[in-house]
Amino acid sequence: MNQSAYTARTGSLRAWGAPQVTVGGGNYLGELVTRYLLGERNYRGARDHLTPLDPEALTVVVVDGPAGLTPRAPLAMIDTAPAMHEALRQLVATGKSEGLTHAALAQSGVCEPQRWLELSQLNVAHARLLDDDATLGVGRYVGEWEVNA
């Protein structure tokens, strides 16, 4: 788990400038945003690896794409980031990827390459890219997948 996305203030977005927002649990930014969007329900905690998946549960994966898509991005402009952003858009849209490696992801400014590699190994039955954004220089994607067991 990316420790820069961790807060000791359980269930609070205070560390990210929203002290008035509490969501009842979670310590990682991805967990907190997921809880904010999905509301109250029975959650399992964040974990380091995606698999094994539970076919009876909704699994929400929160991971950023390249963080070097513009000169003002967190990692400044990285020449290979735009092509990687497009490759990750296609992965989210189709569930398929070709030639995705840890080294290529890391060199393109992806801070959690292992998470993307785990996603690329899933047996995806249906994939759909709902939205993507890179206006702040970091690739962000929203998609839904149905995976085969």
Feature names for model-found ranges:
Residues 66-75:
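Extended accessory regions or peripheral subdomains of proteins
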Residues 2, 63-67:
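Catalytic metal-binding/acid-base residues of hydrolase active sites
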Residues 50-55:
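Short amphipathic alpha-helices and their capping/turn segments at secondary-structure boundaries
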Residues 56-64:
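Beta-strand elements within well-structured catalytic alpha/beta cores of enzymes
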Residues 1-49, 74-149:
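Flexible, D/E/H-enriched segments
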